[in-house]
Amino acid sequence: MKLFKTFRNKTHTSRWLFADSYSNDWKNRAIKLMDLFKSHEYIENSKNQVVEYGCGCFAPFYNLYNGKDGFQVSKYDLVAWDKETNVIDLNSNELTLPITNISVFSGVIEYLNDVPSILRKAIQTSDYLLISYAFVPSALFLDEGKFLKTINNRAIANGWRNHYTNKYLVKLFSNIGIISAIDVWNGNQSLFLIRNPKLDKFE
């Protein structure tokens, strides 16, 4: 059993060590996510530190926004794609996250073992979270066969470790922070901008 678990975890991790596992189209998702922040929370001429988790070889937030419009982007991933990439394993039991204005999880939380715990850590070190998630359509609950087939495909083909509906995501994110804005990308991924409640406290 221990050998199987080791193999399984290495298989899911090793996929992201190679550039051909990433799609350059994900930059469009990054643009739409950042537009959520710019449209709802951005203050003109402000300076914002951004941490891009799971940046991949294309690092869309870093390449699109670093050094522009007051954004300074740091990129993090399982592997150091270049000297600017910080290595991090978000599933580590000893996870420590950097303090920043915006933490980005674009195409990332599907692979996390303990989403609530990690996002609670993230909101404690961030003013905002930008999150994308490939959700499970609620309509699938009306057909158990299709539902199970979908979950099986998510688990085996994609290696995803959690399977949430938008209803669950809204509840989860509302317990972590304040949902500032929501959008949809590509018809099957929800985009969330979450604000740290501390920003609403007046001294």
Question: Which functions belong to the PLM regions below?
Answer:
Residues 1-94, 98, 190, 201-203:
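Conserved N-terminal segment of class I S-adenosyl-L-methionine
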Residues 45-46, 144-162:
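Class I (Rossmann-like) S-adenosyl-L-methionine-dependent methyltransferase catalytic domain
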Residues 47, 100, 125-127:
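Short, well-ordered alpha-helix to beta-strand connector turns
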Residues 101-114:
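A short SAM/SAH-binding and catalytic strip from SAM-dependent methyltransferases
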Residues 112-125:
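A short, conserved alpha-helix within the catalytic core of class I
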Residues 126-138:
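Conserved beta-strand signature within the Rossmann-like core of class I S-adenosyl-L-methionine
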Residues 155-177:
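Short alpha-helix
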Residues 181-203:
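Core SAM-dependent methyltransferase catalytic element
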